[in-house]
C-alpha cells in the first residue's frame, strides 16, 4: 500500500515543500499536491508513491511483446503496471491506464506478485503498460523479491529518468526496452508528449548500458511528423557510436489512437527505408514492429545472413542456433543475453483472474490523505 518514496528531497521543511527526483520534470510539490504523473503525492512534507501495492493491469505475456528479442527469447513474463505516466503522448495506446489520474488498482503486494508470477510459469517480471519510473519504488520491491526466487526483471520505459532513478534501476533491472518516439527528436516530443527535452533519455541510455542493463530500443515512426530519414540516420549513428552496433533496434509502425486519429498507419515502405538507413549506419540487428509476418521480424546472422530466429508477431516459429548461441553456418556469436527458453513452443498469453486472489481498491480523492497517512479507507 502507499509508501514513502525513495526518490525525492525536501526543499523547505517549514513550507513542507519537496522535489520529486524520479523523472527530469522534478516536480516541486507543496502539501497536498501531486506530480505530473498523478501517483506521487506530498502529504505533510513527505513524498508518497500512493499506488505502491496497487496494480491496475497484470498479465502473462511473451517477452517478445515488450519487445525484447535478444534477452531471454521464448520466455514468459509477468507484466504489471500502475496508473499514471510521466509523459502525455497524444497517440498512447494505453491511454486509459497512463492518463488516468486516480488511485486505483488490484491490491498486489510484492510477495503476491512474485507468487502469482511463479504459479503461472513466468520466468521474469516486466514493468510495462505505463511508465515504470514513476512507480519505481514499487517495481524495486517487486524486483528484489523476484530475484530471491530466480526471476529476472525487465521494463519498458520512455527512458525519461534522472541519475537518482538510474541508481535505483541498476540495483535490480536486467534488461530494458527504451521506447523512443519520432527518433527521439525533442520537437516531436514537445508536440506530442508534453516533454520539453529528450536529452535525458540519451544520457540514461548510456548510463544504463554502462552499468550493465541489457538495452533494446524501439522507435515509433509516425507519418508526417516522425518519419524523417535524416533524423533516423542521426539516431542510428548515435546508437552505433554510444551503445554499439549489436544493439537491437525496432522501428514500430504507428496506428492512430487516442487523440491522434487523423494520421494514417505508417506505410510499410517507410519502415523498410528506416531499416536500410539503420543497416547502412552499421546497426546489425534491426526490426520492423507491428507488422506481423514481415521478414524483418526475424533475427538474421549479421555475418552470413542466415535466419537464426524466425518469428510471426510475438511468436517464435523456429530457433536455429548452436547451444552457445552462434550461427550454425559461420559460428558468428549472436548478441543474446541469457538463454533461449523452450517455452517459445507454447501458448504464452495467459489471463490471470486477479479477482480470485485479491481485491480491487479505488480511493476517493477526499479520503486519500487518511488512506496514505493512517491506512483509513472510505472509498
What are these regions (language model features)?
Residues 110-269, 277:
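Conserved AdoMet/S-adenosylmethionine-binding subsite of the radical SAM
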Residues 73, 106, 197, 267, ...:
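Short, conserved glycine- and acidic-residue-centered signature motifs
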Residues 24, 38-41, 86, 93, ...:
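Cys/His-coordinated zinc-binding microdomains
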Residues 1-31, 225-379:
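Auxiliary Fe-S-binding modules of radical SAM enzymes
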Residues 42-175, 345-353, 378:
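Conserved Radical SAM active-site core
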Residues 1-75:
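Flexible, acidic/Gly-rich N-terminal and inter-domain linker regions that tether
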Residues 102, 127, 156, 217-218, ...:
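Residue-level detector of family-conserved "landmark" positions at structurally sensitive sites
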Amino acid at each position: 500500500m502507499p509508501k514513502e518514496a525513495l526518490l525525492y528531497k525536501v526543499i523547505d521543511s517549514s513550507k513542507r515543500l519537496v522535489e520529486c527526483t524520479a523523472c527530469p520534470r522534478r516536480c516541486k510539490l507543496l502539501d497536498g499536491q501531486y506530480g505530473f504523473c498523478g501517483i506521487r503525492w506530498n502529504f505533510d512534507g513527505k513524498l508518497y508513491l500512493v499506488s505502491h501495492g496497487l496494480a491496475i493491469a497484470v498479465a502473462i505475456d511473451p517477452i517478445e511483446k515488450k519487445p525484447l528479442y535478444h534477452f531471454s527469447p521464448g520466455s514468459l513474463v509477468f507484466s504489471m503496471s500502475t496508473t499514471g505516466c510521466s509523459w502525455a503522448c497524444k497517440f498512447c495506446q494505453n491511454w486509459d491506464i497512463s492518463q488516468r489520474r486516480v488511485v486505483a488498482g488490484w491490491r498486489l503486494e510484492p510477495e503476491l506478485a512474485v507468487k502469482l508470477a511463479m504459479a503461472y510459469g513466468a520466468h521474469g517480471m516486466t514493468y510495462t503498460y505505463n511508465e515504470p519510473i514513476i512507480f519505481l519504488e514499487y517495481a524495486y520491491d517487486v524486483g528484489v523479491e523476484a530475484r530471491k526466487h530466480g526471476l529476472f526483471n525487465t521494463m519498458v520505459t520512455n527512458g525519461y529518468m534522472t541519475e537518482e532513478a538510474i541508481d535505483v534501476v541498476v540495483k535490480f533491472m536486467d534488461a530494458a526496452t527504451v521506447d523512443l518516439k519520432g527518433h527521439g527528436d525533442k520537437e516531436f516530443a514537445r508536440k506530442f508528449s508534453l516533454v520539453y527535452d529528450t536529452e535525458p533519455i540519451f544520457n540514461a541510455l548510456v548510463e544504463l548500458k554502462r552499468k550493465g542493463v541489457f538495452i533494446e530500443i524501439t522507435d515509433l515512426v509516425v507519418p508526417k511528423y516522425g518519419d524523417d530519414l535524416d533524423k533516423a540516420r542521426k539516431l542510428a549513428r548515435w546508437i552505433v557510436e554510444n551503445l554499439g552496433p549489436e544493439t537491437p533496434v525496432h522501428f514500430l509502425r504507428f496506428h492512430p489512437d487516442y487523440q491522434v486519429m487523423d494520421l494514417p498507419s505508417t506505410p510499410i515502405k517507410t519502415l523498410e527505408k528506416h531499416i536500410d538507413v539503420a543497416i547502412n549506419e552499421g546497426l546489425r540487428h534491426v526490426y520492423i514492429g507491428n507488422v506481423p509476418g514481415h521478414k524483418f521480424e526475424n533475427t538474421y546472422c549479421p555475418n552470413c545472413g542466415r535466419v537464426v530466429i524466425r518469428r510471426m508477431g510475438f511468436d517464435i516459429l523456429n530457433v536455429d542456433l548452436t547451444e552457445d548461441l552462434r550461427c550454425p553456418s559461420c559460428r558468428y556469436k549472436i548478441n543474446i543475453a541469457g538463454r533461449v527458453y523452450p517455452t517459445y513452443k507454447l501458448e504464452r498469453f495467459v489471463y490471470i483472474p486477479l479477482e480470485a486472489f485479491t481485491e480491487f481498491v479505488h480511493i476517493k480523492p477526499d479520503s486519500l490523505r487518511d488512506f496514505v497517512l493512517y491506512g483509513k479507507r472510505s472509498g
